[in-house]
Amino acid sequence: MFSVEFVSLFTEICSGGSVWGTSGQRILSEFSLDPFTKMELIRDGVLVFGRDFRNLLSFPSRAEVLRAIQRHYEAIRKYGASDAGWLLDTARCLYTLKTNQIAAKTAAGEWALEHHLCPNPEVMEKALEIRRNPEKLLKDESVTAWLKTITPQIQEFADVLENALQKEMHSGSEI
């Protein structure tokens, strides 16, 4: 994925940007610099023009990261249906929760499989296959029919994230 962000150093509000991903291009007029974006900018941002300001950004606290994961978890519970991307989003949340790092969706899905976190590994494997070749596979009627059936598996994987978040909260971390 490639994204462009224009950041106000005083408010940490992005005044605009473009995001390119497998679902296409989106142009945003404004969005907040959330903990995930801050982590990516600080660790992996590439300056294209102007003065590098990453040293002026504060790395998100563990509590901020946990709150961001919690918000994403709530979105998965509310909207997570019939789209393999929700499985990969869940894997990214788990990866960040366990490592305090950010990973690409594909890498996070592979990591979740390697660490035996997926209650339905065959579903994650199919999600990764779609992620690697979306133009071909999303035109396949059998794939689109399959996607309509995976809501229970998305929510079951969200259970894994819920349990990991609860375990983190009980270990003394604040959300």
Language-model features: where?
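Conserved NTP/Mg2+-binding pocket subregion across the NTase superfamily
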Residues: 1-81, 159
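Short glycine-rich, low-complexity/disordered patches
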Residues: 2-3, 86, 174-175
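Hydrophobic alpha-helical packing segments in soluble, helical-rich domains
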Residues: 74-106
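Structured mid-to-C-terminal alpha-helical surface segments
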Residues: 101, 105-175
